[in-house]
């Protein structure tokens, strides 16, 4: 069958294909699925790994993820455009994924026998989730080796902010994402360490894939001087918005940040703000390079559109997207370390360097 070309706008193009479907398609036409597929395909045509359509049915799960509470296996995922695969950015500490040995950089090939590409990330994410106690099978590509995992889903609470006092009265705080309440937990943990007499602070942002931007801004506000620039946000019309520290700092001591290639998004906002304002030195390796901000638009039918709407620049107007932030002191972990989430302190050359600089 030959179809004549008629390259018009999207509405006329869809109408053309609808007529062909109505005329020739043998099976049952599910109008809702057809509409949803058209929307997803349209948005995927933007070729942006962070912009996605969220169906009405998936919105509750999305909002639960944003607050740090959900049922699943506990991984942060990103679209890997080079391989067109879904990549594990990092597993959540203590989660089924971490316990099973899933690592940052692992590529997800299939979930319960169904293969997925980067464009299918939201579908795969929903497939991975389910009722607590049920299992999910995943096929993972690690380098050239394929591995299979069977994991039991659990109720996941993203780890709270953790902290301790190291040698020489050095405080140490780490957290794996910026979720609802992270800034308040960070402040409480710092005050707890301050009561124990810390004189300097190490903030570990390694494997922190980001999260809620406002939480990162609030933590920056605890450290920067009032009116210091935190970041610049630039929209599609080159209209610029400046985010500045609104209060006097509550943290006034030497700070070292730890970063690696899995430090992304909101973590990079915090790292860039503290580095450019001279409030912290960065130790580790270059960060991931996600320097764009998404906003969630809720539509009248209950569905949503998470859309990349702004690029951010550090206070020195340094571009981060697809570039990353260079550390002040580049320190790589030894080759003997195979799992960046489980590094023995004796092997943690990055932490050792941070301690040396914080003394």
What does each model-identified segment do?
Residues 109-110, 306:
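Hydrophobic beta-strand signal
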Residues 105-107, 303:
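Structural motif
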């Amino acid at each position: 069958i030959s179809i004549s070309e008629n390259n018009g706008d999207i509405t006329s193009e869809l109408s053309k294909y609808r007529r062909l479907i109505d005329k020739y398609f043998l099976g049952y036409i599910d109008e809702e699925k057809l509409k949803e597929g058209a929307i997803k395909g349209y948005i995927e045509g933007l070729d942006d790994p962070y912009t996605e359509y969220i169906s009405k049915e998936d919105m509750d799960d999305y909002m639960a993820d944003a607050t740090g509470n959900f049922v699943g296996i506990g991984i942060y995922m990103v679209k890997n455009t080079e391989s067109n695969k879904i990549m594990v950015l990092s597993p959540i500490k203590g989660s089924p994924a971490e316990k099973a040995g899933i690592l940052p950089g692992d590529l997800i090939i299939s979930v319960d026998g169904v293969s997925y590409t980067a464009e299918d990330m939201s579908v795969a994410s929903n497939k991975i989730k389910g009722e607590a106690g049920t299992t999910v099978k995943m096929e993972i590509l690690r380098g050239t080796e394929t591995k299979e995992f069977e994991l039991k889903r659990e109720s996941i609470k993203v780890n709270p902010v953790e902290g301790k006092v190291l040698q020489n009265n050095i405080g140490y705080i780490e957290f794996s994402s910026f979720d609802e309440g992270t800034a308040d937990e960070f402040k409480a943990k710092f005050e707890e360490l301050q009561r124990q007499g810390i004189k300097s602070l190490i903030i570990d942002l390694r494997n922190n894939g980001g999260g809620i931007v406002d939480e990162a801004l609030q933590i920056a506000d605890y450290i920067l001087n009032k009116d210091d620039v935190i970041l610049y946000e630039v929209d599609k019309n080159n209209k610029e918005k400046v985010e500045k520290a609104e209060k006097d700092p509550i943290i006034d001591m030497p700070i070292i940040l730890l970063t690696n290639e899995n430090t992304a998004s909101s973590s990079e906002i915090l790292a860039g703000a503290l580095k450019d304002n001279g409030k912290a030195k960065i130790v580790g390796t270059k960060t991931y390079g996600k320097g764009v901000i998404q906003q969630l638009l809720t539509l009248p039918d209950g569905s949503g559109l998470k859309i990349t709407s702004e690029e951010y620049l550090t206070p020195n107007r340094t571009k981060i997207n697809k570039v990353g932030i260079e550390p002040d002191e580049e320190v790589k972990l030894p080759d003997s370390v195979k799992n960046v989430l489980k590094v023995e302190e004796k092997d943690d050359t990055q932490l050792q360097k941070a301690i040396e600089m914080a003394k």
